[in-house]
């Protein structure tokens, strides 16, 4: 079986309420799909760090209210460690780390690890992201919509 999902690339200088509304309007996640995923990769240019954190929390709260589960946070390990950990440690973590390591060396409990954006596989005409799951089948089910 193939598990599908939908992520939102967070734009830090834009309104988080409008971004969450757009995500909810344009996705139709079903039972068995991944929980909603928020991709946070950049700091804002026009907002303080405090406002940035508050805005991410606003997006998370709006989407969590709809699905009754905490969304998955996708980000780079260093970005998570530097800016997000203390505020979002209760959210499932999907990390990106392309540094040719056996496993990410993070003290944090990551659920998924995207280790390349240059994967090649049968049936795909372009390079794709490859990921590793950190857990067993029951752990995976925790990341899916009931």
Where are the predicted features?
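Hydrophobic faces of well-ordered beta-strands that scaffold small-molecule active sites
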Residues: 3-7, 36-38, 71-73, 93-96, ...
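Aromatic-lined carbohydrate-recognition surfaces of secreted/lumenal glycan-active proteins
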Residues: 67-81
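Functionally critical loop-and-helix segments that line ligand-binding/catalytic clefts
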Residues: 88-146
């Amino acid at each position: 079986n193939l598990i599908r999902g939908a992520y939102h690339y967070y734009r830090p200088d834009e309104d988080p309420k409008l971004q969450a509304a757009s995500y909810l309007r344009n996705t139709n996640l079903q039972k068995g799909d991944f929980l909603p995923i928020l991709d946070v990769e950049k700091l804002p240019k026009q907002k303080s760090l405090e406002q940035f954190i508050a805005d991410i929390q606003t997006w998370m709260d709006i989407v969590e209210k709809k699905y009754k589960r905490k969304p998955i946070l996708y980000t780079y390990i260093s970005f998570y460690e530097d800016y997000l950990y203390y505020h979002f440690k209760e959210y499932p973590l999907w990390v990106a780390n392309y540094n040719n390591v056996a496993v990410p060396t993070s003290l944090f409990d990551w659920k998924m690890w995207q280790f390349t954006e240059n994967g090649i596989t049968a049936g795909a005409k372009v390079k794709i992201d490859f990921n590793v799951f950190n857990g067993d089948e029951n752990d995976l089910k925790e990341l899916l919509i009931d």
